[in-house]
Structures are given as structure tokens and as C-alpha cells.
Amino acid sequence: MTPRISLAGALAALCLLLLAPWPALAADPTSISAITVTTNGQGQQEYSVSLQILLIMTALSFIPAFVMLMTSFTRIIIVFSILRQALGLQSTPSNQVLVGLALFLTMFVMAPVFDKINSQALQPYLNEQIPAQEALQKAEVPLKAFMLAQTRTSDLELFVRLSKRTDIGSPEATPLTILVPAFVTSELKTAFQIGFMIFIPFLIIDLVVSSVLMAMGMMMLSPLIISLPFKIMLFVLVDGWALIIGTLAGSFGTV
């Protein structure tokens, strides 16, 4: 069984776990157990099922922020948006298409990281081999490694200095409250650098078309109308989508 299949099975089991108690609770409202926290023989805290469900439902509200700020999604969606502007297309591809493509490309890029989280943290927790707190700590390790690999040292040092923390001995010990903004800042810089390189060939086409129209005295004709077919043709001839998607996926170094 592959890690991805096991992850899908784990999510399905989690959904069944969340839905199963509701008929019984509706039949007997007094059977709802109190939220309890107990300490086992090893000194570790264990949470009741009710508290675990509450924590899971609370964590679900942070999924959009997690996807946007702790994965490759930010760089990918910004590059796609700049590409659409460079082509001169205001609404094609639509926002829904760009976001969907960015999400699936993010899943592809982050698959090695998610596989490590599944094998090192999620599966041991679901098998009751480790407590929830230890599972969260183990899940942070591959995620931090990914973000540190994409974060510039100058950006990380900036936020460490702003936080006035002096107890951080190594980049791996950086807390997420400092690492995440540093990672996002680096991702924005990288996305704009890639976007600048994408703009150059299309900008040259716009300048050439504008110069030709000016020489012909057709100043009332918008250069965008004439240059748009040439830009689309150039993008198709060089297999632009495969080139950009392949470059984006390879820029993270995880695939």
C-alpha cells in the first residue's frame, strides 16, 4: 500500500469517525462525554475523543492559510497571474482555472513532503503509537525542511532580528511564527523574479508592434489588438505551458 493510498484511507476513516457518533448522540443526548485530558503512565497527556474532534474541526479552519502560506502555492499562483497579464489576456484562463491548476501543481510539488508527514506523523498517530503532541512535532520537521530550503538567509535573519529572539541556535530551531513570514517573503521575491523573465519576450513583441504601427501612421489602432495573436502564437510554438509548469516544479528541488 503506497503512502498516498494510505493517506486517503486515513482521511476516509477520519470522516467516518467524525460522522459515526452523531446518530447515537441524537438518540441519547445525555451520552455525550465530557472533554477530558488524562495523563498516562509515561507522563504524556491523552485527550478524549470529544476534545480530539474539537481540535480537528478547529484545525480545518486553518487549511486555507496553510495551503497559501506554507506550501508552493504562493509562488505558483503569482507566476500564473503575471503570465496572464504578460499575454494581455484579462480573464483567460479564468481565475478558477488558474487556482485549480495551481492547487494540483502544489499537490504534485509537495507530495514528497506530505508522504513524509504521513509516514512519520499521521500513520503512527492513527495507529496510537505516538500522542497528538509528538505527532505535531514530527509533522513540523519535513515541512520546516521544505520551507528552509526555499527561504533566503537574509529574509530569515530579518525576521529573527525583528523578533528579538536570541535563543535560536540553528535555522532548524526557528519557530514557525518566524519561519512562515520569512518563507512567504522569499516566495514573493522569487515569483516576481520569474514573472520579470516571463514578461521580457512579450514586452519586446509589444514594442515592435507599436513601432511598426507608428511608422505606418496607424496611431489610433491599439497595439494590444495586433500584438495579442503574435504573443499567443509565440507562447504556443515554444510549448509555453509545459515550459513554465516544468520550470516552476523544478525550481523547488523536491521533484
Curated annotation (Swiss-Prot):
Compartment(s) where it occurs, according to its Swiss-Prot or TrEMBL record: Cell membrane; Bacterial flagellum basal body
Entry-linked PROSITE patterns: FLIP_1, FLIP_2
GO CC annotations on file: bacterial-type flagellum basal body; plasma membrane
Keyword Membrane: yes
Single biological process term from Gene Ontology: bacterial-type flagellum assembly
Domain of life, source organism: Bacteria
Pfam families: FliP (PF00813)
Membrane topology term: Multi-pass membrane protein
Keywords: Bacterial flagellum, Bacterial flagellum biogenesis, Bacterial flagellum protein export, Cell membrane, Membrane, Protein transport, Transmembrane, Transmembrane helix, Transport
Transmembrane portions of the chain: 7-27, 53-73, 97-117, 194-214, 232-252
Keyword flag DNA damage: no
Family as reported in the entry's similarity comment: Belongs to the FliP/MopC/SpaP family.
Its biological purpose: Plays a role in the flagellum-specific transport system.
Alphabetized PANTHER family for the sequence: FLAGELLAR BIOSYNTHETIC PROTEIN FLIP
Protein name per its UniProtKB record: Flagellar biosynthetic protein FliP
Organism: Pseudomonas aeruginosa (strain ATCC 15692 / DSM 22644 / CIP 104116 / JCM 14847 / LMG 12228 / 1C / PRS 101 / PAO1)
